Amino acid sequence: GVLLRAVDALLQLTDADGEFFPLNDGQKGMSWHTSSLVTAVNVAFLVGGEDPRLLGIAEEQGQVLLDDAGIAVARAIRDGKSQAFEKRSVNLSDGSDGTQGGVAVLRYGDDDLTLVFKYAAQRLSHGHYDKLSFSLYEKGDEVLQDYGLVRFVNIEQKGGGNYLPENRSWAKQTVAHNTLVLNETSHFEGKYEIGSQHHSDLWFYDDSSPDVQVVSATETNAYPGTAIRRTLAMIKDDAFEKPLVLDILKVDSGQENRYDLPFYYFGQVMKVNFEYDSPDSLVPLGEKSGYQHLYLEGVGKPASESTRFSWMDDGRFYTLTSATDAGDELLLTRLGANDPDFNLRRDPAFMIRRDGVADTVFATTIETHGSYSPVSERALNTNSSIAGLEIVHDSDDYTAVAITGVAGQVSLFIVANSESGASQGHVLTLGDRSYKWAGPYRYGPR
């Protein structure tokens, strides 16, 4: 039973193209076509009750073992028993007893949109300092990326194919991931001896509704004296062309800090709604903890309470909308500083910096929309459907975020901060209206 569940978990941790999500020191491009997964699928089929869904994977792999397991798979495919392997939303717990955090994968449709949320344990020397980080995929293409590792495996010209120095100075560092950094210092001070003692904790996971799927987890040890809770929701609403992601990151700290929240995207910037200055010469953003590898390409200030950043990649449009404060800085960065051997990709990022505050909330939506065809030269639905994003309430008990569409409709997402039971009743009064619901969150009209 354990082996079969392990094979299923491996297959669930792949994108639409069968490539594994590059968690920790994972290599991008590694997929279920590798020989070890051919073996795993064949053996699991033979000894695990001949699950016909595994035949769908075997057909994708295009090869079988030359033994009893492979013959069983080949015959079953020949006899027309194959079924498609269903990718589903799943929450995988970490640790020998399943209590050391985990990895959650939220999916909409046939991998139309896939979110990977990592709140796991450190995982030995290959682990990264990336608590509560996430990545986002659309049909197998990275929208917001996890960098992966800095190694050119078995390519002799690059360090003999071994791990390169930048794997430690960049890829493992917190700022290399889509997660929160305090005071330009990595989680656990970037020390394995500290990180290996801790893990994040699940607050709740709910995929019972295909239209609103939510995962929430808490980290209290990455920065002593600071509690971070991140709630990620994948929402399919008729007001928007495609599903959108809502990201609520709540911080409670005993001291004022500098907070940096980066988002690593691909493609070409289309439009922003804030003014920014580009330096005459590029300089590193910092001196350590990965910051020494980031060039600062632009810096600006929010022009409104909702900051908008849009880009295009591979014929698709994306918009990030964030509820920003007037004192925030908006940074445009690019990887490549202090990299004399060109071991790093030149990847861009949009970073929100909030300085001199203790308790705070970051609220952000990531929206996929529209398309562009160079053949027809037609650009469709290039603009965001979100007019504004506002944190309308934050307390020890609840955080509420209002999403306003361009047509004027307003949706309200409320997450419970003190009780996460599935049947727990809640009441929150905002202005002259009270909202009642059961469970750890509420989404609906305002």
PLM features: residue spans?
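Catalytic and substrate-binding regions of extracellular carbohydrate-active enzymes
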Residues: 46, 52-284, 358-364, 368-371
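Short, hydrophobic/aromatic-enriched beta-strand segments in well-ordered soluble domains
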Residues: 263, 316-337, 360-372
